[in-house]
Amino acid sequence: MNLTSTTNCLENNHISTSDQEKLVQPTPLLLSLLKSAGAQKETFTMKEVIYHLGQYIMAKQLYDEKQQHIVHCSNDPLGELFGVQEFSVKEPRRLYAMISRNLVSANVKESSEDIFGNVCCFPDKQSSQKEKLQELPDKLIAPASDSKPCNLSQRKSSNETEEISSVDHPAEQQRKRHKSDSFSLTFDESLSWWVISGLRCDRNSSESTDSSSNSDPERHSTNDNSEHDSDQFSVEFEVESVCSDDYSPSGDEHGVSEEEEINDEVYQVTIYETEESETDSFDVDTEISEADYWKCPECGEVNPPLPSYCPRCWTVRKDWLPEQRRKEPPPSKRKLLEIEEDEGFDVPDCKKSKLTSSQDTNVDKKEAENIQNSESQETEDCSQPSTSGSIASCSQEVTKEDSSKESMESSLPLTSIDPCVICQTRPKNGCIVHGRTGHLMACYTCAKKLKKRNKPCPVCREPIQMIVLTYFS
């Protein structure tokens, strides 16, 4: 993309050729800067001023390497000229204001106004005035012929149609205003950065833009061949002008046509900011105290108790879960049988002890002798014929049974002697079994009713597995 391509962008935004070629005269300081960049004249067009200004910035390498749209001019005469330390080419209003303060328009409007007045006052002499109109664009374009060669005959015809259309429709030319400024950036692989900007305030009528667009392709083709390479691309920004009707306090809202409203585009940008939700943070939980926090042994980070790892170094917390104990395999049936055969029970001590074969025989002999003694005593008691002895023996048996019952009742717990908790009549002989434990608190009949109705144990609320009828001896 070169100067011609940028000109094409400007013309597509309804900027006429006459406004592009308006001559301006820079101040002495700005003129010296432009001449150091290769300028050889004293009057320039607006496009030429910005072109040479871009060449100056590029030669001095005042642009930022990372952000090329920013120009640093604090230690340069350009900063003294504009009165700033740095500026951005993405701010066309500011750039246009800084440049326009150092420009003076050339005094070339008097001849054009006289010619336009003669055409309006003397319609009979239009044929002679057309020749003067053809000579006027030559005078305007002649100072800029060194930097931009173009087709003279094509430009004459385009300028003639523009001037006639502006004379025929002066009111329509005043009514239509241009509301946006065109600002183009051009990037080159070899030069890295340069800028050309066309800024204006007035918009011409639709007839003048149509005639100028028909005369532009040939001029674009000649300039494309003589300027820079084709490896460049342009970025165009549309911004509101300072001189437009929207910014003037006395602007007429009804002076904008429907075509201009259609051409204007509005972009809406919505920016969303992501924030951490308060529910994700552990600091909100007031139940967690400082003693519950744990310190990572690797990085020393103090972490909340909930995650099992350190969020900084991903180290798993020690003793997070208890160690799994290995279950020992159950002993086989053969080993159990061997243990039962080898071990016996000592009755008075209730301790397991191994019995030898000699001890087994002695135990058997003692048991046999005890049985014989008891039988001999019974026979002797029965052989006595006296009635007094029989009555005494019977009384002794009754007293023995009563004493045995009393001893049994004293040996039983108090809870088993009490009646059933549910019916309060029958004894507690129904044991409610659940797992390896049971509760004796009801009779067998009431306990069976609880099991049939799928009720839990009244004591521990565990599901009932079975009911066992219990006997007390």
Swiss-Prot record:
Composition-biased stretches (Basic and acidic residues): 216-231, 398-408
Ranges of biased composition (kind: Polar residues): 370-397
Keywords: Cytoplasm, Metal-binding, Nucleus, Transferase, Ubl conjugation pathway, Zinc, Zinc-finger
Biased composition, class Low complexity, residue ranges: 206-215
Localization of this protein: Nucleus, Nucleoplasm; Cytoplasm; Nucleus, Nucleolus; Nucleus
Swiss-Prot/TrEMBL GO biological process terms: apoptotic process; negative regulation of apoptotic process; positive regulation of mitotic cell cycle; protein ubiquitination; regulation of biological quality; regulation of gene expression; ubiquitin-dependent protein catabolic process
UniProt motif Nuclear localization signal: location: 173-179
Pfam families xrefs: SWIB, zf-C3HC4_3, Zn_ribbon_RanBP
GO molecular function: identical protein binding; p53 binding; ubiquitin protein ligase activity; zinc ion binding
Region (Disordered): 140-181, 205-285, 348-411
Known EC number: 2.3.2.27
Domain SWIB/MDM2 stretches: 22-105
Catalytic EC class: transferase
Zinc finger motifs (RING-type), residue ranges: 420-461
Catalysed reactions, semicolon-separated: S-ubiquitinyl-[E2 ubiquitin-conjugating enzyme]-L-cysteine + [acceptor protein]-L-lysine = [E2 ubiquitin-conjugating enzyme]-L-cysteine + N(6)-ubiquitinyl-[acceptor protein]-L-lysine
Chain ranges of zinc fingers (RanBP2-type): 290-319
Family: Belongs to the MDM2/MDM4 family.
Function: E3 ubiquitin-protein ligase that mediates ubiquitination of p53/TP53, leading to its degradation by the proteasome.
The protein, known as: E3 ubiquitin-protein ligase Mdm2
Organism: Xenopus laevis
